[in-house]
């Protein structure tokens, strides 16, 4: 069997930062080429970077959320681009604002189909939500690492809530170990 950890792909990294001052988003939107700002639809200004591909949500408070990046390196690179664009508009930005990863969403494949009913019973209901009429996946809340895994009958899974790439690897290891111990993984 292929090691399921080898199948892990980061799908999205969400991080936050700030420039420590309020912004006039209407003014920034007029001067920042490619910016989208429609305060009736969303309170922040959206600025997309192409390489690496991500979206920065810039708020009046000076807080910035970066989403859509495929790695923590891409988050840092995208936000450096945003900081430089703001500096080009004569907006004061610290040399190295703190960037905090809030969430990493990863996908993986356990390599065999899963009996979600048996897993729900085997893992115990205190950490599990499984209502197939509502959602086809089984929601498994892990304590260590502190993440949520969505398991699907196909054997595919999504891990969300991680702060580091290793959180997904540890979660997959834990899931494989627990399902194997229960005899529920081929």
Curated annotation (Swiss-Prot):
InterPro entries: TBP, TBP_archaea, TBP_dom_sf
Regions crossing the membrane: none
An annotated GO BP: DNA-templated transcription initiation
GO-annotated molecular function: DNA binding; DNA-binding transcription factor activity
UniProt superkingdom: Archaea
Renumbered ranges of Sequence repeats: 10-86, 101-179
Record keywords, A-Z: DNA-binding, Repeat, Transcription, Transcription regulation
Gene3D superfamilies noted in UniProt: TATA-Binding Protein (3.30.310.10)
A Pfam family this chain is assigned to: TBP
Keyword Transcription: yes
Role: General factor that plays a role in the activation of archaeal genes transcribed by RNA polymerase. Binds specifically to the TATA box promoter element which lies close to the position of transcription initiation.
HAMAP family membership: TATA_bind_prot_arch
Entry's family note: Belongs to the TBP family.
Name of this chain's protein: TATA-box-binding protein
Organism: Haloarcula marismortui (strain ATCC 43049 / DSM 3752 / JCM 8966 / VKM B-1809)
């Amino acid at each position: 069997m292929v090691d399921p950890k080898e199948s892990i792909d980061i799908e999205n990294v969400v991080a936050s930062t700030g420039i420590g001052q309020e912004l006039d988003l209407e003014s920034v939107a007029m001067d920042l080429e490619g910016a989208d700002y429609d305060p009736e639809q969303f309170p922040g200004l959206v600025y997309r970077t192409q390489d690496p591909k991500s979206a920065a949500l810039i708020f009046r408070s000076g807080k910035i959320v970066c989403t859509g990046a495929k790695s923590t390196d891409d988050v840092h690179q995208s936000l450096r681009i945003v900081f430089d664009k703001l500096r080009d508009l004569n907006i004061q930005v610290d040399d190295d604002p703190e960037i905090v990863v809030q969430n990493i969403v990863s996908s993986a494949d356990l390599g065999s189909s899963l009996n979600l009913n048996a897993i729900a019973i085997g893992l115990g209901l205190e950490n599990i939500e499984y209502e197939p009429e509502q959602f086809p996946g089984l929601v498994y809340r892990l304590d260590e690492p502190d993440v949520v895994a969505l398991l699907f009958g196909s054997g595919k899974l999504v891990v969300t809530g991680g702060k580091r790439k290793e959180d997904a690897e540890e979660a997959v290891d834990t899931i494989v170990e627990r399902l194997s111990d229960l005899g529920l993984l081929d």
